[in-house]
A protein has these predicted regions:
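Short glycine-rich anion-binding loops that position phosphate/pyrophosphate groups of nucleotides
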Residues: 26, 61-63, 110-111
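Glycine- (often His-adjacent) and acidic-residue-rich active-site loop
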Residues: 59-93
Length: 197
């Protein structure tokens, strides 16, 4: 089922009890709130679908895996109610992933920032390429990575989470693999896809 709008898209295909859930957005696969809501709903639907055993979560294109939440929407937040609504979008996705009754495998082909790192951490098993660098840049814009912290800390530990939060430089895919975020890292997307199939 394809769910499309000007704020990005979701596409779900089911074959041999494997659901492939692909998201995309022109701004480096970032998530406006409407796309976060659709992703939450689709994860809940797949969790309840008896025809599905495994979910492969991936993003479109060959660039970034996910640039996190929509920066334009963040800049538009002007009060506490809007802030709560904005940050709840990613929290709802991460909770849907955590509560999902299916195994979620992340196919990580490129860079991830902020909420994108949270999505990777919420996957049960994440496979990546050497291009799949990660970064938490929240402090650089005056906020903390509070929404994704529980998921990321569970996956890589408090020490690595603190390092990522305070040292906002890019971390390599090998670093992420050593910390437990990625189960395996491949040299190419073709090798990544061969492992998944």
């Amino acid at each position: 089922m394809a769910l499309q709008n000007p704020n990005g898209f979701l596409l779900t295909t089911i074959e041999n009890k494997i659901a492939t859930l692909e998201f995309g957005h022109p701004a480096s696969n970032s998530f406006p709130s409407v796309l976060l809501e659709r992703l939450t709903n689709e994860l809940n639907n797949l969790s309840n679908n008896s025809a599905v055993l495994v979910i492969i979560l991936k993003s479109s294109g060959s660039g970034a895996f996910c640039a996190g939440a929509s920066f334009d929407e963040l800049l538009a937040v002007s009060n506490q109610e809007e802030a709560t609504q904005f940050f709840s979008g990613f929290a709802n996705v991460l909770n849907a992933m955590r509560n999902c009754s299916k195994i979620i495998m992340g196919r990580i082909h490129g860079k991830a920032v902020g909420g994108g790192v949270g999505i990777i951490a919420a996957c049960d098993y994440a496979l990546a390429t050497t291009e799949s660098t990660i970064k938490l840049s929240e402090l650089a814009i005056g906020i903390g990575p509070f929404v994704i912290e529980p998921a990321v800390s569970r996956k890589i530990g408090k020490s690595a989470m603190t390092e990522m939060t305070l040292d906002t430089e890019w971390k390599s895919a090998i670093w992420a693999n050593q910390k437990g975020l990625y189960a395996k890292v491949f040299a190419t997307t073709a090798e990544l896809d061969a492992e998944i199939m």
